[in-house]
Amino acid sequence: MKAVIQRVKEAKVSVEGRVVGEIGQGVLVLLGVEIGDACPQADWMAEKIVNLRIFADSEGKMNLALPEVKGEMLAVSQFTLAGNCSKGRRPSFDTAAAPEEANRLYSYFMGQVWERGVPVQSGIFQADMEVSLVNDGPVTFILETPPKR
């Protein structure tokens, strides 16, 4: 499982011109599910992102996590994170999970974030989406779950 996390002042996702998810301060998470990912990977990713100390404290130091700043999450599924561009000019998506499994784990991931006390908004799985955001920093991180055992 891979994620791109961007600290945002606000973000929204639209489908066919209609806003389907919108947040204020928090993180935009682009989430890619790969073959072999399961609930333990989603648990790890939810725990890591919710508790990642990427928000400034009173001294301007990155020292606060989402719950401490009452931040929100906008989660957007993005199978292209599983893309491999190492050969040729066309990306290969051989490592991307099947859509049914990816959707199940995407939904499970969001549930785990909710259980940890962070409000979550989302895009629509497999929809053609437009994502708008105001980066805060910018602060961007790429996370990948530890190797599967």
From Swiss-Prot:
Biological processes annotated in GO: D-amino acid catabolic process
Domain of life: Bacteria
Molecular function in Gene Ontology: D-tyrosyl-tRNA(Tyr) deacylase activity; Gly-tRNA(Ala) deacylase activity; Ser(Gly)-tRNA(Ala) hydrolase activity; tRNA binding
Keyword Transmembrane helix recorded: no
EC assignment: 3.1.1.96
Cell location: Cytoplasm
Pfam families per the UniProt record, alphabetical: Tyr_Deacylase
UniProt keyword annotations, A-Z: Cytoplasm, Hydrolase, RNA-binding, tRNA-binding
GO cellular component terms, semicolon-separated: cytoplasm
Motif (Gly-cisPro motif, important for rejection of L-amino acids): 137-138
Catalytic activity entry: glycyl-tRNA(Ala) + H2O = tRNA(Ala) + glycine + H(+); a D-aminoacyl-tRNA + H2O = a tRNA + a D-alpha-amino acid + H(+)
Subunit: Homodimer.
Function: An aminoacyl-tRNA editing enzyme that deacylates mischarged D-aminoacyl-tRNAs. Also deacylates mischarged glycyl-tRNA(Ala), protecting cells against glycine mischarging by AlaRS. Acts via tRNA-based rather than protein-based catalysis; rejects L-amino acids rather than detecting D-amino acids in the active site. By recycling D-aminoacyl-tRNA to D-amino acids and free tRNA molecules, this enzyme counteracts the toxicity associated with the formation of D-aminoacyl-tRNA entities in vivo and helps enforce protein L-homochirality.
PANTHER family: D-AMINOACYL-TRNA DEACYLASE 1, D-TYROSYL-TRNA TYR DEACYLASE
Family: Belongs to the DTD family.
HAMAP family: Deacylase_Dtd
Domain notes: A Gly-cisPro motif from one monomer fits into the active site of the other monomer to allow specific chiral rejection of L-amino acids.
Record protein name field: D-aminoacyl-tRNA deacylase
Gene that this sequence comes from: dtd
